[in-house]
């Protein structure tokens, strides 16, 4: 597959950052809390973010950049905007659990045009370019054929602040778990979506999201033939905070369960 300049660049820098994260994985980490005690940041997050931002500013100096750790906070209205999660799965990483990723998306005039998710521990690179399909290491991806929620394995996530949060996902989790074949919690939103695109997971839902959490993965799912909306069934935008992604075959069924929870 021949990708355009932006996508090839995103692939290169994602792999560079992933290599550095993997090299530091078994080191002792300086772990700090951000908004809550379970909202963590490590020196690896910050190193990866600074590396990615520096590479983008050198190559595309006029582009905006929006990052999880705050190194760069451009407006969502920027004509060209890079959305970066330099270490998706920080809690996993800090505990030595080998499930984390680097997630990069490029937005042009409000539309995500390329997305890259790199899983260093599994040596996997997921890539999507709008109109060109979703790919994993040269293999074209397609969502699963699970026809109904009862035959689907899904993944979800939970917010950092659970107590007193009406969107803590506990009601929704219980409602879906009683109807689905299985529900998993991997702790890495970008990889959840990549696995939906690959047909390994059949669906994913989560609230309290930021655009860098899901933008690359959402494009992967769409380009793999799946469906991505908000909880109300509207097509996603970079301002969406509650996301549902499926193979498209039982999407309305899942939305109905979430609404009824």
Language model segments and positions:
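N-terminal subdomain of lithium-sensitive/metallo-dependent phosphomonoesterases centered on the IMPase/IPPase/PAP
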Residues: 1-87, 249, 256
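Residue-level signal for inorganic ion chemistry
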Residues: 21-24, 45, 56, 90, ...
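DPxDG-like acidic metal-binding loop motif
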Residues: 76-135
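An extended, acidic
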Residues: 142-261
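A short, compositionally biased
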Residues: 27, 100, 128-132, 222, ...
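Generic detector of well-ordered alpha-helical packing
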Residues: 46, 50, 69, 86-89, ...
């Amino acid at each position: 597959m021949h990708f355009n300049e932006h996508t090839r660049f995103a692939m290169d820098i994602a792999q560079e950052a992933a290599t550095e994260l993997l090299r530091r994985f078994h080191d002792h980490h300086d772990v700090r809390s951000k908004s809550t005690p379970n909202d963590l940041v490590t020196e690896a997050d910050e190193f990866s973010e600074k590396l990615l931002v520096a590479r983008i500013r050198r190559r595309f100096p006029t582009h905006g950049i929006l990052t999880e750790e705050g190194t760069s906070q451009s407006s969502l209205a920027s004509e060209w905007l890079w959305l970066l999660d330099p270490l998706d799965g920080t809690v996993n990483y800090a505990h030595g659990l080998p499930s984390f990723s680097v997630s990069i998306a490029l937005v042009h005039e409000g539309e995500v045009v390329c997305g890259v998710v790199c899983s260093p521990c599994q040596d996997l690179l997921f890539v999507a370019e709008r109109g060109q399909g979703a790919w994993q290491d040269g293999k074209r991806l397609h969502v699963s054929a699970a026809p109904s929620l009862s035959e689907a394995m899904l993944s979800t996530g939970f917010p950092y602040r659970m107590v007193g949060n009406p969107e803590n996902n506990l009601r929704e989790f219980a409602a879906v778990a009683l109807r689905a074949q299985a529900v998993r919690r991997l702790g890495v939103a970008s990889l959840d979506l990549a696995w939906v695109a690959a047909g390994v997971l059949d669906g994913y839902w989560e609230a309290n999201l930021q655009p860098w959490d899901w933008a690359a993965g959402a494009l992967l799912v769409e380009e793999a033939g799946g469906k991505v909306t908000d909880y109300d069934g509207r097509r996603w935008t970079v301002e969406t905070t509650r996301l549902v992604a499926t193979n498209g075959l039982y999407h309305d069924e899942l939305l109905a369960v979430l609404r009824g929870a």
